[in-house]
């Protein structure tokens, strides 16, 4: 059995969406690092040279193949309507709510202030799609978000240089190797909105995308 980390629920309704993302980030990471079910995910990360230090820094987690988020957040008093609005649960055709992320490695997505606003889940088997992102919510607009920007923004501002990766894992590995101005798109498209997020005083953007058709399409924007 796994003992869950204690959390304090804030009373402000305005913060509920942020709260549930913050709570789940801690829960998913705790599950990755401490549960037997997280073993496969831990071994996958080890093969990609992502170890405990990076896991904690990037708050990587694991969502097991059960309704962990739904049951845990309901036990804290959060309503289904809020969880649906946050994209944490999904309503099935039969009308039953289930966890959106099941048996997936979890990458929290932060806004520019470092608040978790969404998740991206990577499958650890042959399930499709390979990556599953949170739906668009009042907090999360995919075309305006760059992975790791909240952490890299100071270095980007100081150097005027951005290293743009296609994937989260590449960005995480590069950070461990000393690249502190690396960010990643959530997929393969880099938009004008992304460019406006980075800022006006950028001297150079280094593209480190995959050399396949999807990656080449992204660099042509």
Each predicted region: which residue ranges?
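Phosphate-handling DNA/RNA-contact segment within nucleic-acid enzymes
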Residues: 9-24, 66-205, 218-219
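Phosphate/diphosphate-binding loops
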Residues: 211-221
